[in-house]
C-alpha cells in the first residue's frame, strides 16, 4: 500500500507511543558514568555531549571497560520519539558483545517528545530534508572518533523506524560508515548516488509491514540495483511494522493498528545484523 508522507507521519505518531511505553518498562537511572559487571565483562556507561550548528546533543555511550585496544563501533539512531531507554538498552546489548556503542541524540538537548504531535514536529524536518540526517549523524560520528578505544575504520550505524530512515539516507548521502542496518525503517528519501554511497546496507523488513508497502520496497530495491549498491534485503514472514519492539502488541491492540512484537523476527534480525557486522568488519 502506497501512502503519502502526511499519512505515514500520522501513523508513526501512534507507533511512536511504543517507544514511550518500552522506555517506561526498561527505565533505569543512569548518571554520568556507571559500571555493570557480569563475569569478566564490565559495561561502562557514559553520557556524551557534543555540538553542531549551535545545538548541543546528548548521546549515550556503552562499552566493555575490561577490554583494551581499539574495537568496532556502532552508532544507534532512536525512533522518532527521541533517545529513550529502549535505544540505550540496544547500546548495552552491543557493548556486551564487545562493540563500542553510542546511542545518538538526533534532536538535540536530549529532547524526548511529550506526545505524538511533538514527535511528528521533531521528525518532520528530517523527512523534508534528508541531508539533515547526514549532518546530525556526522556530528555523532566525529564525537565517537575522539575516544581512544574507537576504531575509526570500523564504524557502522543502525536505526529503528525513523532511525532506519536516518541511517539509510545518511549512507546514501555519503556518510563515512562501513555499513548501516535499518530495522523496520521507512525506505523513502533521496535516491542513492554511486559516487556518494560508501556503506554496505542491510535492511530488516517485516513481511507483513503495512506501513512500508510493496511499492516502496520495490522502488528502494530498484534504486539500489540501478547503481550496483552492496545491499542485503531481509524479509521476516508475518512480521509487522515495529516487530523488534516488545511493547508493539499491546499498543497495536489499544490503537487498532496492525503492529505486533515478533520475538522470532526480533531474534533473527539481530542475528542477521551480527552476521552483517562480521562481514563488514
Which residues are covered by each model-predicted region?
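Bacterial N-terminal signal peptides that target proteins for export
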Residues: 1-10
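Serine-hydrolase catalytic machinery in alpha/beta-hydrolase-like enzymes
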Residues: 28-42, 47-149, 246-260
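Short alpha-helix in the alpha/beta-hydrolase fold that links the catalytic acid
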Residues: 90, 213-223
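C-terminal catalytic histidine-bearing segment of alpha/beta-hydrolase fold enzymes
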Residues: 227-281
Amino acid at each position: 500500500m502506497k501512502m503519502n508522507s502526511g499519512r505515514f507521519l500520522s501513523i508513526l505518531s501512534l507507533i511512536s507511543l511504543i517507544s514511550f511505553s518500552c522506555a517506561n518498562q526498561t527505565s533505569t537511572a543512569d548518571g554520568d558514568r556507571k559500571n555493570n559487571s557480569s563475569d569478566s565483562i564490565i559495561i561502562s556507561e557514559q553520557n556524551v555531549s557534543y555540538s553542531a550548528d549551535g545545538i548541543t546533543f546528548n548521546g549515550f555511550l556503552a562499552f566493555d571497560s575490561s577490554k583494551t585496544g581499539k574495537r568496532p563501533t556502532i552508532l544507534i539512531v532512536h525512533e522518532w520519539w527521541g533517545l529513550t531507554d529502549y535505544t540505550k538498552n540496544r547500546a548495552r546489548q552491543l557493548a556486551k558483545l564487545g562493540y563500542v556503542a553510542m546511542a545518538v541524540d538526533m534532536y538535540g538537548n536530549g529532547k524526548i517528545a511529550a506526545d505524538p504531535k511533538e514527535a511528528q514536529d521533531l521528525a518532520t524536518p528530517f523527512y523534508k530534508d534528508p541531508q539533515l540526517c547526514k549532518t546530525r549523524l556526522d556530528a555523532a560520528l566525529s564525537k565517537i572518533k575522539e575516544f581512544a578505544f574507537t576504531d575509526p575504520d570500523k564504524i557502522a550505524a543502525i536505526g529503528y523506524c525513523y532511525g532506519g530512515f536516518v541511517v539509510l539516507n545518511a549512507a546514501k548521502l555519503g556518510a563515512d560508515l562501513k555499513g548501516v542496518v535499518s530495522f523496520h525503517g521507512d525506505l523513502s528519501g533521496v535516491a542513492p548516488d554511486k559516487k556518494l554511497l560508501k556503506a554496505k546496507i542491510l535492511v530488516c523488513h517485516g513481511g507483513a509491514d503495512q506501513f512500508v508497502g510493496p511499492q516502496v520496497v520495490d522502488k528502494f530495491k530498484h534504486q539500489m540495483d540501478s547503481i550496483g549498491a552492496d545491499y542485503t534485503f531481509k524479509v521476516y514472514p508475518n512480521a509487522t511494522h515495529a516487530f523488534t519492539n516488545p511493547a508493539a502488541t499491546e499498543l497495536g491492540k489499544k490503537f487498532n493498528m496492525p503492529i505486533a512484537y515478533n520475538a522470532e523476527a526480533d531474534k533473527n534480525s539481530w542475528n542477521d545484523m551480527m552476521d552483517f557486522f562480521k562481514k563488514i568488519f
